Amino acid sequence: MNGPALLKCICDETRFEILELLQKDNELCVNDYVEKLKKDQPLISHHLKTLKQCGIVKSREEGKKAMYSISNLQLSTLISTVTKTSNKIPTLCNDENSC
């Protein structure tokens, strides 16, 4: 996967929130995301499917649950770096629709 394709996969706000949680918690199931992100289960499942198709997350079965985790250490490091860097950049535009 090239850089722009990777960024396209993670640029959605919900997908990035999922990855931030995974970066901190290592492994979660769909219900964990629903509870922590306060978003509907079908939406979370859709975004996890997209992240899995991109190769960014992997899943394993644990009983009736699918447990999701970031697929490799470099991706976890990337998510951490993006989060830390974005927190240090001043907000230049308060209207995200016009930026």
Over which residues does each language-model region extend?
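Amphipathic alpha-helical dimerization/coiled-coil segments
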Residues: M1-N2, K24, N72-C99
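N-terminal helix-turn-helix DNA-binding core of bacterial DNA-binding proteins
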Residues: N2-K39, K65-Q74
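Beta-hairpin "wing" of winged helix-turn-helix
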Residues: K52-E62, S69
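Short, hydrophobic-biased segments on the C-terminal half of alpha helices
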Residues: L19, L48-K49
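Conserved alpha-helical interface elements of two-component signaling phosphotransfer modules
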Residues: P42
